[in-house]
């Protein structure tokens, strides 16, 4: 009997990309391919790319360059490049010109076509370059090979309508399209039947959910509906745009026992001047008022964020506004980024681009403040008993288990492997900068 062919997928970028890779893997499983962790062994290599920052693109170029030798050694190796980076104007042609050994290039709107492209390459030994300019309707029921066996990503909507001036996402992911609530509910019910305990609802802006549907539906109503699914233990979600986070959503999080008390609420800047230039549609004051509303409405809530340093025209005063906002809000954690020029976005043409050395100086100052606050917030957990969903063995210490609190804190602790996949209580004995240490009680 012929040995099954092996595939290897490398994914850059956000959780949406991670779920797209799970769908690619699901289609390949149906084509009798098996997954491998080793590029050298693979008959098919897929790079699922990101273009939110230049650094992500440089990683793709570097990794593609290393595949040339492998392709020379294994002429039948099929190399595929897909995802957001490919959806950019002229990028597919650039990739084929620079890396002619790539066999399949496709974008974000035609993932479901991948089996056909692969068969064409296998049968005809030709290459396929297929980028769809416009998003089609949502394709339901695609096979999916999940990365975990107790927690799963479930996309509730695709695309983005916000057009922040620094961001490439609306250009490569298309306009907002919401899935029908019954399709989302049925997918989660099937996952629960298979033993899944935690679901993370995904969307570029989950608070816009339902706007493209014919029926009366919004994100708050969806949370309440999904909270009734029997056997599901936890519901998480990301990402929330501050301008669309309503009182109804705050109330739903507070009321629904399965919805975790954690909101990822990207602020991007603490300066109203910069927020206007970014087209974020809220002011510093709006954001702080929203945070106060969240904190008073949801007990023990954790708030995390994204911050961009060095946006064009950012003055020292603008940066200090960001720093003071971080100290006022006291985020549980923050993803901090240096502004990266993205061709095709309005901000790429803005004057007063900030010199790299100034960006780095501000970035380091911000990071120091963020980390100090994270550690302080973690220390508040010392001595407390918290509910953990046990996810598996600790990545740093195989003799320990790891899991997360409802607020998303990573906890390492000694325990029995039979606890994996269960909710247990753990007493926090020590707080570290990025994680907690505990013992089962």
Curated annotation (Swiss-Prot):
One of its GO terms (molecular function) is metal ion binding. It holds the Pfam family UPF0004. It comes from the Bacteria. It is an enzyme of class 2 (transferase). Keywords: 4Fe-4S, Cytoplasm, Iron, Iron-sulfur, Metal-binding, S-adenosyl-L-methionine, Transferase, tRNA processing. Residues 146-376 form the Radical SAM core domain. Residues 5-123 form the MTTase N-terminal domain. Binds 2 [4Fe-4S] clusters. One cluster is coordinated with 3 cysteines and an exchangeable S-adenosyl-L-methionine. [4Fe-4S] cluster 1 binds at residues 14, 50, 84. Disulfide bonds: none annotated. Residues 379-441 form the TRAM domain. Its main location: cytoplasm. Its cofactor is [4Fe-4S] cluster. It is found in: Cytoplasm. [4Fe-4S] cluster 2 binds at residues 160, 164, 167. CDD domains: Radical_SAM. The keyword Transferase applies. Monomer. Belongs to the methylthiotransferase family. MiaB subfamily. This is tRNA-2-methylthio-N(6)-dimethylallyladenosine synthase. It comes from Clostridium acetobutylicum (strain ATCC 824 / DSM 792 / JCM 1419 / IAM 19013 / LMG 5710 / NBRC 13948 / NRRL B-527 / VKM B-1787 / 2291 / W).
